[in-house]
Protein backbone atom coordinates (compact mmCIF):
# COMPACT_ATOMS: atom_id res chain seq x y z
CA UNK A 1 0.00 0.00 0.00
CA UNK A 2 1.56 3.31 -1.02
CA UNK A 3 2.32 5.71 1.83
CA UNK A 4 1.22 8.75 -0.18
CA UNK A 5 -2.40 7.64 -0.51
CA UNK A 6 -4.64 10.13 1.24
CA UNK A 7 -6.91 9.20 4.12
CA UNK A 8 -9.96 9.37 1.86
CA UNK A 9 -8.59 6.63 -0.36
CA UNK A 10 -7.32 4.58 2.56
CA UNK A 11 -10.65 4.44 4.36
CA UNK A 12 -12.42 1.99 2.03
CA UNK A 13 -9.32 -0.19 1.88
CA UNK A 14 -9.10 -0.41 5.64
CA UNK A 15 -12.80 -1.20 5.83
CA UNK A 16 -12.37 -3.94 3.25
CA UNK A 17 -9.51 -5.51 5.22
CA UNK A 18 -11.64 -5.46 8.36
CA UNK A 19 -14.44 -7.28 6.55
CA UNK A 20 -11.99 -9.91 5.29
CA UNK A 21 -10.71 -10.41 8.83
CA UNK A 22 -14.29 -10.91 10.05
CA UNK A 23 -14.90 -13.47 7.29
CA UNK A 24 -11.80 -15.42 8.31
CA UNK A 25 -12.94 -15.30 11.94
CA UNK A 26 -16.38 -16.67 10.99
CA UNK A 27 -14.82 -19.50 9.00
CA UNK A 28 -12.51 -20.39 11.88
CA UNK A 29 -15.45 -20.43 14.29
CA UNK A 30 -17.40 -22.70 11.93
CA UNK A 31 -14.46 -25.08 11.58
CA UNK A 32 -13.88 -25.06 15.33
CA UNK A 33 -17.29 -26.70 15.61
CA UNK A 34 -16.06 -29.53 13.38
CA UNK A 35 -13.52 -31.53 15.36
CA UNK A 36 -13.88 -34.42 12.93
CA UNK A 37 -15.75 -35.32 9.76
CA UNK A 38 -16.16 -38.33 7.51
CA UNK A 39 -18.10 -38.28 4.25
CA UNK A 40 -18.47 -39.80 0.82
CA UNK A 41 -17.61 -37.53 -2.07
CA UNK A 42 -18.26 -37.21 -5.78
CA UNK A 43 -15.67 -35.35 -7.82
CA UNK A 44 -16.03 -33.46 -11.11
CA UNK A 45 -13.04 -31.80 -12.78
CA UNK A 46 -13.52 -29.25 -15.57
CA UNK A 47 -10.87 -27.48 -17.61
CA UNK A 48 -10.56 -23.78 -18.38
CA UNK A 49 -13.21 -24.21 -21.12
CA UNK A 50 -15.62 -25.83 -18.61
CA UNK A 51 -15.23 -29.21 -20.31
CA UNK A 52 -15.48 -32.19 -17.95
CA UNK A 53 -12.12 -33.96 -18.01
CA UNK A 54 -12.54 -36.30 -15.04
CA UNK A 55 -15.10 -37.64 -12.60
CA UNK A 56 -14.52 -39.71 -9.51
CA UNK A 57 -15.79 -40.83 -6.13
CA UNK A 58 -14.41 -41.84 -2.79
CA UNK A 59 -14.24 -41.29 0.95
CA UNK A 60 -12.95 -38.20 2.75
CA UNK A 61 -12.20 -37.69 6.45
CA UNK A 62 -10.48 -35.14 8.65
CA UNK A 63 -9.84 -34.66 12.33
CA UNK A 64 -8.28 -31.93 14.42
CA UNK A 65 -5.39 -31.58 14.81
CA UNK A 66 -3.80 -32.13 11.41
CA UNK A 67 -5.25 -35.50 10.43
CA UNK A 68 -6.50 -36.10 6.94
CA UNK A 69 -7.73 -39.07 4.87
CA UNK A 70 -8.54 -39.16 1.18
CA UNK A 71 -9.43 -42.37 -0.66
CA UNK A 72 -10.33 -42.06 -4.33
CA UNK A 73 -12.06 -45.31 -5.30
CA UNK A 74 -13.03 -44.49 -8.90
CA UNK A 75 -12.06 -44.24 -11.68
CA UNK A 76 -8.52 -45.10 -10.48
CA UNK A 77 -7.74 -45.83 -6.87
CA UNK A 78 -5.40 -43.57 -4.90
CA UNK A 79 -5.00 -42.76 -1.25
CA UNK A 80 -3.68 -39.85 0.81
CA UNK A 81 -3.21 -40.21 4.56
CA UNK A 82 -1.89 -37.60 7.00
CA UNK A 83 -1.27 -38.57 10.62
CA UNK A 84 -0.31 -35.09 11.79
CA UNK A 85 3.41 -35.57 11.18
CA UNK A 86 3.79 -37.34 7.83
CA UNK A 87 1.72 -37.43 4.66
CA UNK A 88 1.51 -40.65 2.64
CA UNK A 89 0.42 -40.79 -1.01
CA UNK A 90 -0.34 -44.30 -2.27
CA UNK A 91 -0.84 -45.24 -5.92
CA UNK A 92 -1.86 -48.93 -6.05
CA UNK A 93 -1.63 -49.11 -9.85
CA UNK A 94 1.97 -47.86 -9.87
CA UNK A 95 2.70 -49.78 -6.65
CA UNK A 96 4.34 -46.67 -5.22
CA UNK A 97 4.15 -44.78 -1.94
CA UNK A 98 5.43 -41.21 -1.57
CA UNK A 99 6.09 -39.93 1.97
CA UNK A 100 6.27 -36.20 2.62
CA UNK A 101 6.59 -33.95 5.61
CA UNK A 102 3.02 -33.06 6.54
CA UNK A 103 3.62 -29.37 7.17
CA UNK A 104 5.50 -28.86 3.90
CA UNK A 105 2.89 -30.73 1.85
CA UNK A 106 -0.36 -29.45 3.29
CA UNK A 107 0.71 -25.86 3.87
CA UNK A 108 1.00 -25.35 0.12
CA UNK A 109 -2.78 -25.72 -0.17
CA UNK A 110 -5.69 -23.70 1.25
CA UNK A 111 -7.17 -27.08 2.22
CA UNK A 112 -4.72 -26.80 5.11
CA UNK A 113 -7.19 -24.51 6.83
CA UNK A 114 -9.60 -27.43 7.28
CA UNK A 115 -7.19 -29.17 9.66
CA UNK A 116 -4.99 -26.32 10.94
CA UNK A 117 -5.99 -23.96 13.75
CA UNK A 118 -2.77 -21.96 14.17
CA UNK A 119 -2.51 -18.26 13.35
CA UNK A 120 0.67 -18.70 11.28
CA UNK A 121 -1.10 -20.90 8.73
CA UNK A 122 -4.20 -18.70 8.54
CA UNK A 123 -2.10 -15.58 7.97
CA UNK A 124 -1.01 -17.01 4.61
CA UNK A 125 -4.54 -16.78 3.16
CA UNK A 126 -7.32 -14.27 2.61
CA UNK A 127 -10.92 -15.33 3.26
CA UNK A 128 -14.06 -13.83 1.72
CA UNK A 129 -17.57 -14.97 2.66
CA UNK A 130 -20.12 -15.44 -0.11
CA UNK A 131 -23.51 -16.53 1.31
CA UNK A 132 -22.92 -19.99 2.83
CA UNK A 133 -19.50 -20.35 1.21
CA UNK A 134 -16.03 -19.00 1.93
CA UNK A 135 -13.49 -18.26 -0.77
CA UNK A 136 -9.93 -18.90 0.39
CA UNK A 137 -7.03 -17.48 -1.61
CA UNK A 138 -3.32 -17.93 -0.91
CA UNK A 139 -1.40 -14.68 -0.57
CA UNK A 140 1.60 -16.28 -2.28
CA UNK A 141 1.56 -15.97 -6.07
CA UNK A 142 3.38 -19.27 -6.62
CA UNK A 143 1.05 -21.51 -4.61
CA UNK A 144 -0.19 -23.46 -7.65
CA UNK A 145 -3.78 -23.13 -6.40
CA UNK A 146 -5.71 -19.97 -7.19
CA UNK A 147 -8.58 -20.44 -4.74
CA UNK A 148 -10.63 -22.87 -2.69
CA UNK A 149 -14.33 -22.45 -1.94
CA UNK A 150 -15.78 -24.31 1.04
CA UNK A 151 -19.55 -24.38 1.58
CA UNK A 152 -21.62 -25.29 4.61
CA UNK A 153 -25.22 -26.31 5.25
CA UNK A 154 -26.30 -25.58 8.82
CA UNK A 155 -22.68 -25.63 9.94
CA UNK A 156 -21.79 -28.88 8.17
CA UNK A 157 -19.30 -28.93 5.31
CA UNK A 158 -21.25 -30.12 2.27
CA UNK A 159 -19.14 -29.17 -0.75
CA UNK A 160 -15.93 -27.49 -1.81
CA UNK A 161 -14.01 -26.76 -4.98
CA UNK A 162 -10.38 -26.13 -5.88
CA UNK A 163 -9.28 -23.88 -8.76
CA UNK A 164 -5.68 -24.34 -9.89
CA UNK A 165 -3.44 -21.89 -11.75
CA UNK A 166 -4.15 -23.64 -15.08
CA UNK A 167 -7.87 -22.99 -14.84
CA UNK A 168 -8.88 -26.53 -13.87
CA UNK A 169 -11.75 -26.61 -11.37
CA UNK A 170 -12.17 -29.67 -9.12
CA UNK A 171 -15.60 -29.79 -7.49
CA UNK A 172 -16.41 -32.10 -4.58
CA UNK A 173 -19.94 -32.81 -3.35
CA UNK A 174 -20.15 -34.51 0.05
CA UNK A 175 -22.81 -36.87 1.37
CA UNK A 176 -23.35 -39.09 4.43
CA UNK A 177 -21.41 -36.64 6.62
CA UNK A 178 -20.86 -37.63 10.24
CA UNK A 179 -18.28 -37.34 13.01
CA UNK A 180 -15.66 -40.06 13.03
CA UNK A 181 -16.05 -42.91 15.52
CA UNK A 182 -13.43 -44.96 17.34
CA UNK A 183 -13.02 -47.35 14.42
CA UNK A 184 -12.58 -44.48 11.95
CA UNK A 185 -9.47 -43.26 13.78
CA UNK A 186 -7.54 -46.05 12.07
CA UNK A 187 -8.00 -44.19 8.78
CA UNK A 188 -5.30 -41.73 9.81
CA UNK A 189 -2.65 -44.43 10.32
CA UNK A 190 -1.17 -45.55 7.01
CA UNK A 191 -0.14 -49.20 6.79
CA UNK A 192 2.63 -49.64 4.22
CA UNK A 193 1.69 -52.38 1.72
CA UNK A 194 4.20 -55.06 0.83
CA UNK A 195 6.15 -54.98 -2.44
CA UNK A 196 5.75 -51.28 -3.18
CA UNK A 197 8.37 -48.70 -4.11
CA UNK A 198 8.83 -46.04 -1.43
CA UNK A 199 9.88 -42.49 -2.27
CA UNK A 200 10.65 -40.93 1.11
CA UNK A 201 10.92 -37.22 0.40
CA UNK A 202 11.22 -36.36 4.08
CA UNK A 203 14.89 -37.28 3.94
CA UNK A 204 15.54 -34.78 1.17
CA UNK A 205 14.54 -31.82 3.33
CA UNK A 206 16.50 -32.77 6.43
UniProtKB/Swiss-Prot annotation:
Gene3D superfamilies: Lipoprotein localisation LolA/LolB/LppX. Monomer. GO terms for biological process: lipoprotein localization to outer membrane; lipoprotein transport. GO terms for cellular component: outer membrane-bounded periplasmic space. Belongs to the LolA family. Residues 1-21 form the signal peptide. This is Outer-membrane lipoprotein carrier protein. The gene is lolA. Participates in the translocation of lipoproteins from the inner membrane to the outer membrane. Only forms a complex with a lipoprotein if the residue after the N-terminal Cys is not an aspartate (The Asp acts as a targeting signal to indicate that the lipoprotein should stay in the inner membrane). Transmembrane segments: none annotated. It is found in: Periplasm. It holds the Pfam family LolA. Keywords: Chaperone, Periplasm, Protein transport, Signal, Transport. PANTHER family: OUTER-MEMBRANE LIPOPROTEIN CARRIER PROTEIN. Its main location: periplasm. The keyword Transport applies.
Amino acid sequence: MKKLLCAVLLSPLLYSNAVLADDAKQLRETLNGTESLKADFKQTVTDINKKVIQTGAGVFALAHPNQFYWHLTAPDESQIVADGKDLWIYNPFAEEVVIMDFAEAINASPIALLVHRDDATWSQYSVTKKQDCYEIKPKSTDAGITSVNVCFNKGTLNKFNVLDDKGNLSQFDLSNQHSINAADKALFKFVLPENVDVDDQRLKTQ
